[in-house]
Amino acid sequence: MNVIDTDDLEKHTPMMRQYLTMKAEHHDMLLFYRMGDFYELFYDDAKRASELLGISLTARGKSGGDPIPMAGLPYHAVEGYLAKLVQIGQSVAICEQIGDPATSKGPVERKVVRIVTPGTLTDEALLQERQDNLLAAVYQGKIGFGYATLDVSSGRFVIAELDTRESLEAELQRTNPVEILYSEDFGELGLLNGFKGKRRRPEWEFDYDTSIKLLLTQFGTKDLHGFGIADARLSLQAAGCLMQYVKDTQRTALPHINAITRFNQTDSIVLDAATRRNLELTQNLAGGRDNTLAAVLDNTATPMGSRMLQRWIHQPLRDPKHIKARQQAVTELLDTTAHEGLHEQLKALGDIERIMARLALRTARPRDFARLRQALGLLPELQQSLSTLSAPHTTQLRQHIGEFPAEQALLERAIVDNPPMLIRDGGVIREGYNSELDEWRGLSEGASDYLVQLEAREKERTGINTLKVGYNRVHGYYIEVSRLQSSQVPLNYQRRQTLKNMERYITPELKEYEEKVLSSQGKALALEKQLWEQLFDLILPKLHELQAFARAAAELDVLSNFAERAETLGYTCPELSQDIGVQIEAGRHPVVERVSQTPFIANPVTLHNQRRMLIVTGPNMGGKSTYMRQVALITLMAHIGCFVPADRALIGPIDRIFTRIGASDDLASGRSTFMVEMTETANILHNASASSLVLMDEIGRGTSTYDGLSLAWSAAEYLAQQVGAMTLFATHYFELTQLPELMAGVYNVHLDAIEHDDTIAFMHAVQEGAASKSYGLQVAALAGVPNKVIKAAKHKLQQLESRDHQAEGTRTPIQSLLALPEPVENPALTKLSNINPDNLTPKQALDLLYELKRLS
């Protein structure tokens, strides 16, 4: 029941009227409606929750004459159910009872106090600790797109102006948001396939003027020039929608969102969506994290360091100055072995970044404050460790870490050593922090002694040996006497409860004491909650400095991690060159060498101005794809400041890395494997430059032999002669090995293999020159193809080779066929192709005929 007609509300009970009114305000999400110890869901929400969560679907009487579908879940287990829902992209509005049932004449007053969506999570239990949790918004203009992302759990706010559909696709792949807001007229919904939390928003939420006002109010500035984003119109519209959505869902101030940055593609190496996917940077082809570059490089000490590392991997730097600053820091950490001590110190800091976000939102829990206290207490020791380091970048980070002795001392005085999870039942504020709280607690905590004394006194006074004094939460304090001795109780005993073998009583004295104790408990809890809220006010003035500390600690963690990885995995520091080129000695694939059961064979690569393209041949299973990927990964690692798996690496400037490796049908978009392959190829041919690194694997294999060969030849020729990109071009078309004879800068290399009888041994070693054969039948035999089929294939191969040998004398050489001169354009045909006959008058058509006759 998503749309509520208010005229029909009178048909329902008062409680259901209340529910339906609230549901109408939150029609696009599940409504958890608190009733006692349960959250109830009704109508379509109940059916959906039953399906998604596996909870029972029942009915609750009738309202408006029809049975009401209902499903419920206990309030104390809600976090587990919320975790399941947000993982599948579902949003939830949580409606709590805020009125007192005892004093309510109608339905208990209720209010939606919390909205949980996949992209606005801050609760530790609902977040993946080593992954960013990004909310994104996208807006489509007449030309280009505006894109904005916000991590509410850290406050990181980034926008990007994107010119093309391909660049938006790459950004979606890079940022991998868990929730995406898009406008009603967004025209590229196909790009959002595969993302779970999609939210269509009204066009007015993307209004430019409204967006600017929202952002200025949030940042407390007069304009946006200081952020360098004033001209980013489309992305500011996306950012405004995003900001409004967060305000609507969080319903509180957002002081930790205090800056916004612009992602400029020119600052980092551009990686399109296909490249990120094919290189398996942070996600493997199956969607997991195993056997990815991040899995190998990530031995960080903190969750916030792990998240930063993944951002670095997806955003390799182009500025050599920034790369060298990271390299110098890593080198010093490695040479001094300082990384070993830093790892342990940083590990004890925990996830300060997300703790600070919860603090800013005032949703931090007692244990968050305890962790913050612990982290602040470690800073003097951390500062001491950093004081011995002199690398400029490390020194700069140390300045941001600072020390917070006043805040650490405050938390030491205020919070008990091992606080409970929630403030709800108290027990969080340390004794001695507040004298009034100690006084109220003293009254309540002295109750045990009082009850012991009262019991002894009453036993002596009455002579009843079964008399006991006790307490329970339902009936309060009581004096208990056995049924047999109940006739002996004094006249001032008032019966409170009758049990099977016992009677329970209350006396005026005990009643008075009960009221005093319960009053003191209530006052103590109320005061403790008040003191708890004041702690936020006392810590928040240091929010920005604490956020800077968290960012600096995360970066130190990544740099320290790079040093440890270099030492453990045998990596070397790559050299940066001003000249275009990639030269690697004994390079290794960082992932394959870690998972391989056999020693990895290291291989070189040399690309420079006079050697721009390598035609890579060799058998299937010979290692061509691994070799190509390792070149790209080593290049990328060098540009994030990481050491690389090679004996030596000299890397020149790179603007883009392209890969066309492997493909499968894109069923969602209705594209065949060959269409996917050609789309990726077209993107490379349109966008690659002389500073790009291009990996092309098996172009043309998805169509007929001559079609495929022609496409592969032409693509290689275009890259070598028109683009001049540094290219590794793997192929099984041996005709392409003739390219070096026809074009300067093109060379053959091959992956070696040794054949013995009917078996083959892959050497995985790269050698100069072309491969002699493809070994396809031997590989098929290794794969388990039946021997009968292999024998038939050998016979057929001999027939084909014999026929080809006989025809050699009459065939035109391949270089003559494929290296034909460019076709000369016919001016008459060119003119004709540009004509729109619907726009010609009879006179213009006649004049055009004469002109075409002249041109022909």
Swiss-Prot record:
Gene: mutS
Organism encoding this protein: Shewanella baltica (strain OS195)
Gene Ontology CC: cytosol
Entries under Pfam families matching the protein: MutS_I, MutS_II, MutS_III, MutS_IV, MutS_V
Annotated function: This protein is involved in the repair of mismatches in DNA. It is possible that it carries out the mismatch recognition step. This protein has a weak ATPase activity.
UniProt-recorded name of the protein: DNA mismatch repair protein MutS
Record bears the keyword Hydrolase: no
Positions bound to ATP: 618-625
Gene3D superfamilies according to UniProt: 1.10.1420.10, 6.10.140.430, DNA repair protein MutS, domain I, MutS, connector domain, P-loop containing nucleotide triphosphate hydrolases
GO molecular function: ATP binding; ATP-dependent DNA damage sensor activity; damaged DNA binding; mismatched DNA binding
Record's keyword terms, sorted: ATP-binding, DNA damage, DNA repair, DNA-binding, Nucleotide-binding
